[in-house]
Each structure stands twice: as C-alpha cells, then as structure tokens.
UniProtKB/Swiss-Prot annotation:
Name the record gives this protein: Trigger factor
UniProt free text on domains: Consists of 3 domains; the N-terminus binds the ribosome, the middle domain has PPIase activity, while the C-terminus has intrinsic chaperone activity on its own.
Molecular function per GO: peptidyl-prolyl cis-trans isomerase activity; protein folding chaperone; ribosome binding
GO cellular component assignments: cytoplasm
Compartment(s) where it occurs, according to its Swiss-Prot or TrEMBL record: Cytoplasm
EC primary class: isomerase
Family, similarity comment: Belongs to the FKBP-type PPIase family. Tig subfamily.
GO biological process, one term: chaperone-mediated protein folding
Annotated catalysed reactions: [protein]-peptidylproline (omega=180) = [protein]-peptidylproline (omega=0)
Keywords on record: Cell cycle, Cell division, Chaperone, Cytoplasm, Isomerase, Rotamase
Species this protein is from: Dechloromonas aromatica (strain RCB)
Coarse class of the protein's main subcellular location: cytoplasm
Enzyme Commission number(s): 5.2.1.8
C-alpha cells in the first residue's frame, strides 16, 4: 500500500492510494475458499464445490468487498497518519494507470477547518433587565380568566368582546356565492374571525335585528374570484352574549391546580412561573446576541459535506412535522435550497462552539446538569418524577448537557464582550400584543 496527499483548496484534500493487485487477489482467493465451504450446488457435496464454480458465481462480489475494505483501511491509515479530521465521506475515483501490479485510486474529501477562536473584546451585548411586579401577575390573571370566559345573553347592542350568533347570506351581482352562507354562526367581535368591515356591520346590532350592507373583499383575499370584489350581505342577529369572566376566588384557584383553593398561593405560583419564564426569555435574548458575536468574530469556511448533511436532516425534520400535522408530503415537495442558509449557519455555529468549548475547557459538570434538571422539574406538578425521568435515559441527560455547555459558552462570551443593561418591557419580552 502506498499513499500521497495533496491540498486542492482551503478544505478539500485529495489522497492518492495505490493498492497491490496481488494483495487483493490473495485475500479474494481466501474469501472465496471460505465461502465455498458453505456453498451448496446440485451434484456436489456440501463444501466440495470446485473453486472455479465458486469464483464464477461469487468472484465479482468477493472482489468488490475486498477492494472496498482495502480502500477503507488504506484511507483510514493515511488520514490518521496525516492527522486529518475528515468531514463527511470521501469520494473514491479510479485513476488511469499503466501499472500491472497496482490499482490506483484518488480519494477526494473535505477536512474540518482549523482556527483559533476570534477576539470578542469589541463585541457588544445588551442584557435585558426586568423584575416581575404585581402588575404582571394581575395581567397574567386577566389572561387566564379570559381563557376561561363564559357568555350570557345580553339585551343590548353587540359590542367588542361579545359573542354573537348570526345567519348570513352573501350575494355577488344578486346571486349567492359559494361559502357565503351560514346559519347559527357564532363568533366573538374583535377577535378577527371575520373581515373588519363585516364585524363593524354586526357591531351595534341587537338580537332579532336584520341588516343589509355592502362589503369589498381585500385585493389579496384567498378566494381569487372574490378578491377586490364588492358583494352584498344580508344578516340576522339571533343572539348577543356578553362575556362573563370567572371571579378570582377559591373555585378559580382550584381550577388552576391549587388544591386548597388559596388565592394567595395561586398568585405566588403564577409569580414564580413568570419569573422562570422571564429568566428563560432573557437568557434566549442573550444567547441570540452571543451567537451573532461568535459568527462575526469567526468568519470560517465550513465543509460543504457537513452543510449538505444538515440540509438533509432539516428536510427530514420538516417532512415529519408536516406528516404530524396531517399534511401529505408528496403533494408539497420540499426543496433543499429552502434550508441552505439555516443549515450553513447551524454547521458554522456548531464548529465554532466546539472549538471554543475545547480551547476554553467549558464542558458541563454533573452538578451543573443536575441543577438544570431540577430547575426544569420545578415547573411540573411532581418534580421528583420528572428528575427520575431525565436520569432514566442517558440520551435525555446528554440533551441537557448540550444546553449546559451552550450556557457555559454564553457566560464565557459575556465575560469577554462589552455588556450593557437595558430595562425591558414585559409585553415585548414575552412577545405579547399590547
């Protein structure tokens, strides 16, 4: 066996491999003899099949297997000797040669980039600061009450947040159009279930009232035959129901999982949950900025092979997600280019994070993993069961360990970067509409 190496570009390498034909033929003969011992051919006793018949039937298979194994061995020895970190799989190409004693091949592959983590002293990170107040607890309670709203008949004109039940018929040029009719149709005013002009026409009407009005569909309306068209609706309001929010009492507290119905305990639990969520959101904001800082400080070239593999992984995840949603994947072809940028970013960050962790020794400790598991478990009704669930499977702990390592990297970057604090607005941080 002989091997030479060459550098094609920044990450691509070529290894020229030379394999002795005699070695291949020798191993091939030994393999065929072993196969012949178990071969059954009519007219011959088991294990007594002539070698030429064994070779005729299995020679090509044996030669392919031996050559493949020899190439793998020679390639592995070469890259190990040269201390090359191979990214992906090599492409093996036969070479034209006049040699009668050797088979010549080229293995083309990529290697991992070698780099030293860049300087982060000039990076700027903004740390959101927010203390959960009684006002946030009250606002959360209001949201929870609205999620449990009931409705009662109201003898008045319909207003926003009321639920109305109507019959309606839509006509275009005096003719009812498909999808434009319904009876006993309920919806809540102000939730955007109907077009704004439709809701405006219903608002102010009382039960038993009938109205006729014109409505122009938006130019980008999903039904192309109605987009931009003006139609006429006839409606009859059958019910107007006002929202009734549950009282903040023991019954409500019990419905929220407080066994003894203690409202004070309920508020304390909501506050604790909000603090955990605020902490998680702030950590997420910091992490996003840290990752951007790492990308900016480390403009590395990444192996195309790794990006292609990540694209395939993302495509498979997208297919599974679509299937879980009841969608037919075959009817919605997924294109690799949709995931190219995301895949390249993920691969780049993965390589940078791995190098930072190795260089700065930022591996997660068992104590750190345990703390994270316990913190996660606190948001469940039976924390001890959740902790046992995590420790029952090594893979679950590995996922937590991965997050812990990322947290270590975030803290390390924050120790190097210029960090300024900025007061955060609760609704903005939580992604809620004001």
């Amino acid at each position: 066996m002989e091997a030479t190496t060459a550098q094609a570009n920044e990450l691509e390498r070529r290894v020229d491999l030379s394999i002795a034909i005699a070695d291949v033929e020798k191993e091939m003969e030994q393999r065929l003899k072993r196969m012949g011992k178990n071969m059954k051919v009519p007219g011959f006793r088991p294990g007594k099949v002539p070698f030429n018949i064994v070779k005729q039937q299995y020679g090509d298979q044996a030669r392919h297997e031996v050559l493949s194994e020899e190439l793998d061995r020679v390639f592995g020895e070469t890259v190990t000797e040269k201390k090359m970190r191979v990214a992906g799989y090599p492409r093996i190409e036969p070479k034209t040669t006049e040699s009668n004693s050797h088979l010549e091949f080229s293995a083309i592959f990529e290697v991992y980039p070698e780099f030293t983590p860049g300087d982060l002293s000039g990076s700027e990170v903004e740390r959101p600061v927010l203390e959960v107040s009684a006002a946030e607890v009250d606002k959360t309670l209001d949201i929870l009450r609205k999620q449990r709203v009931s409705y009662a008949d109201a003898d008045r004109a319909a207003a926003k947040e009321d639920r109305v039940v109507i019959d309606f018929t839509g006509k275009k040029d005096g003719v009812p159009f498909p999808g434009g009719q319904a009876n006993d149709y309920p919806f809540v005013l102000g939730q955007g279930m109907m077009l704004p002009d439709f809701e405006n026409a219903v608002e102010g009407a009382k039960a038993g009232e009938t109205k006729t009005f014109d409505l122009t569909f938006p130019a980008d309306y999903h039904a192309k035959d109605l987009a931009g068209q003006t139609v006429q609706f006839d409606i009859t309001v059958k019910q107007v129901q006002a929202p009734v929010l549950p009282e903040l009492d023991a019954e409500f507290a019990t419905s929220m999982g407080i066994a003894d119905g203690d409202v004070t305990k309920m508020r304390a639990e909501i506050e604790a949950n909000l603090k955990r969520e605020v902490k998680r959101r702030i950590e997420g904001k910091l992490k996003d900025q840290v990752m951007e800082a790492l990308l900016k400080a480390n403009p590395i070239t990444v192996p195309v092979a790794l990006v292609d593999m990540e694209i395939q992984r993302l495509m498979q995840a997208a297919r599974q997600d679509m299937e879980q949603r009841g969608m037919k994947v075959k009817d919605m072809p997924i294109q690799p280019e949709w995931f190219a940028d995301q895949a390249k970013r993920r691969v780049t960050l993965g390589l940078i994070l791995a190098e930072v962790v190795k260089t700065e020794k930022l591996q997660a400790s068992p104590e750190q993993v345990r703390t994270m598991v316990e913190e996660t478990a606190q948001s469940y009704e039976h924390p001890e069961e959740v902790i046992r669930w995590y420790y029952a499977q090594p893979q679950r702990l590995q996922e937590v360990e991965g997050v812990a390592i990322e947290n270590n990297v975030v803290e390390w970057v924050l120790s190097k970067a210029k960090v300024t604090e900025k007061a955060a607005v609760f609704d903005e941080l939580m992604g809620q509409k004001q």
